[in-house]
Structures are given as C-alpha cells and as structure tokens.
Amino acid sequence: MLLLVDCSSCRTPLHLPPGATRIRCAICHAFTLIAPEPRLQSHASASPFPFPNSSPAPSTFIYPPPTPSPYTHAPHAPSPFNHAPPDSYPFTHAPPASSPFNHAPPGPPPPVHGQKRAVIVGVSYKNTKDELKGCINDANCMKFMLMKRFQFPESCILMLTEEEADPMRWPTKNNITMAMHWLVLSCKPGDSLVFHFSGHGNNQMDDNGDEVDGFDETLLPVDHRTSGVIVDDEINATIVRPLPYGVKLHAIVDACHSGTVMDLPYLCRMDRLGNYEWEDHRPKTGMWKGTSGGEVFSFTGCDDDQTSADTPQLSGSAWTGAMTYAFIQAIERGHGMTYGSLLNAMRSTVHEIFDKNKGRELVEVGGADFLSTLLGLLILGASPPDEEEEVNQAPQKTQEPQLSANEAFAVYEKPFSL
C-alpha cells in the first residue's frame, strides 16, 4: 500500500519509499525522520484509509488532511534581477535580454498564506527521444507574465523545470504531486492560485467509469518511464475537489489530449465564430468532480483527441508551446477582459498559424530539417521520430484550445482575472 507522511516542518504530504528512514520535503527541504517500520505498519494496518482521529507522532503522520503550515521564514529579499522578459515572450519590442529565471539562487520556500500562489511546470525531457524545445520557455514566460501583469510575488511562485539547480525542484512525478499539494495547502477565501504545465500529455483507458469518452487524460513528468504518469483523476482529487469557497484556481495546461485533464464537470464548446455552448461532462456514476465551493477554470492546449504544437512559428524564433504563447499574447493584446474573449483570441491565433501554413511547415527535429505537419510533428504528447526516419504524415486536425470549469457560466460576461 502507498504510504504518505506529512513533512515535519510544512506538513506537505510526502510519498514514503519502502524502508526509508528519513525523507526530504520537495517544498521546504526539511528532513523528516521516520519511525522504525513496525510503528509505521501499526498505523497503516488500522485502516486502509487512515483519518485524523488516529494521532501518530509528527514525524510519522500517515496522510490526513494537511494542517496549517508553521512557516516562519521571512519573505524573499528583493530580487537582484531586472526581470527582463524571456526571449520567447510575446510583444517584446526591444531585443530581449536572456531569461534571469533559469538559475536563480535558492531561497526559503514560498509562504503558504500568500494571496496569490502559482506552480509552474516545464518539462523538456532533455536528451531523450521525447525531448521538447519550447517547454522551458513556456515556464519562464508564464512566470514573467504572472509577476509583471498580475502581481504574483516571485516568492510565491514554485518553478519545476530540469534547469533548476535543486533536484527537489525538477519536474518528477513526486515533485509535481507535492507541488500540487502545496498549491492548495491552507488556502483561504480571496486566494488566487495558478497551475501551469507545459510538456507531454497522453490518454489511457478509463478504469472507473468517470469519463464520458472512456479515456483518462494524463500528464507526463520527466520520469514518466520509471515512475508513471499523472492521471486526471489524481489531479482533480488533489487541487480541484479540496478547493474551498472563495478560492479561485486557474489551470493552464499546454499538452496533447489535455481538453479535460482537470476532470471538471463542464467543457465550453466554441466554434470559429465565437459561438459556444457548455457540454456536460459529469460522470454518469454520480462521482463528484467539482470543488468544495471554490472556482476552477482550465485553459488547455487542445481537445482530448487532438495534439498540441511545440513550434517556433508563433514567436518567429524561439520555440514555445502554441497554446501558452497564444494565451499570453491574447492577454498582452487586451483580449483578456472576459473568459470568452480570451478563449476566442487564443483559438483565432492557433487557427491563423495553422491555416497560414496549411498544416505544413519546415521544422527542426534532432538537428535535421524536413517538411512535416506543423501540428503533427513536434507535438506535445507524441514521440519525435529518429533523426534518420523519413516523415510523411498527413496534416493533423487543427489544434483548438479549450476552456472547462466546475460550473457553467456566461463566458462573454464573466471578467477574467488571475
């Protein structure tokens, strides 16, 4: 049975490897000592679903609902960086400076009571056949926008990329899971939360009957080949269902097959004219996929049966995810007044670049240039071909960014804000 222990410092639930005598928290970096195995087994054997009414010692908590964080760290000192926009950031009218975010000095963990909090995940799968070129740029651009446009404190943004110096902040399955727990930890009315993921996505057969189309959507961490994928059911249970009244969460997921990756009850179907209707995705089993009173809005790269592009075509030089670039571009151009205007602008941008290239464009894979489909070759969620493999694919369906939510609403009336 999978065991979870609470961090002795910040109470973030941690996956406990079998036989471990101590574990390091990916969020606050504190070490938690583990009691001898018989004591752990005695707690685990009491019930397959332990509850808070059993009170193990702080160092041996078997995951109950998290308690408020005891952080006493002072907030970050002002950053020495000038926060120039990343190279791939939309609408940089002067020669952009290189990103200051890749090797920022480590600091104390983000406080859990900030009014604005974000987890940003960019997975490049470097030096593997799954490698993507735009995901680190996506992460840096998203961080820059949240800080400059929406006043997210840098100290309240948790970055997970392979470029982080600390391996505890690499985008592994365990670290991403812990970061999601941290994101919603002790949130309170008025909090605004953001979860951004740029990387590979996929789908697999649904095993519990909660999917309308019969498939679960998944996100692929950097270690997915050894640790497995993150399934939409897990994401929903971790950052959607616990969300209390007055808390708002925005998920921006740039990955293949990501349309309903948050497992939310309603999906907004919009055509090219901007007309829309809400599609009911509530499970026929009656399983609850909504929140505990909070609001969740999810912008995703494409529909569940589509793929998302990793391409230099939108920025003109730097590689980015098409959806992330279109999302930031729409906001920078003033189209983010309402959820409907933002979604419509994003879709128009992606449609425009696809129509312009008629599904075909010169792209680069592993150092070799050749013609293939813009949205069918370097796509998030598909494995790039070997360098010597000849590619001759038919054009894919146009990528169409999606919006889903925990409740249906008037998308052209509700103001968008992070």
Swiss-Prot record:
Name of protein: Metacaspase-2
Phenotype when changing residue 135 to A: No effect on the cell death inhibitory function
UniProt source species: Arabidopsis thaliana
Active site: 200, 256
GO biological process: defense response; negative regulation of programmed cell death; proteolysis
Underlying gene: AMC2
Disordered: annotated segments: 68-113, 385-406
Reported phenotype of the disruption mutant: No visible phenotype under normal growth conditions, but enhancement of hypersensitive cell death response upon infection with avirulent pathogen.
UniProt EC number: 3.4.22.-
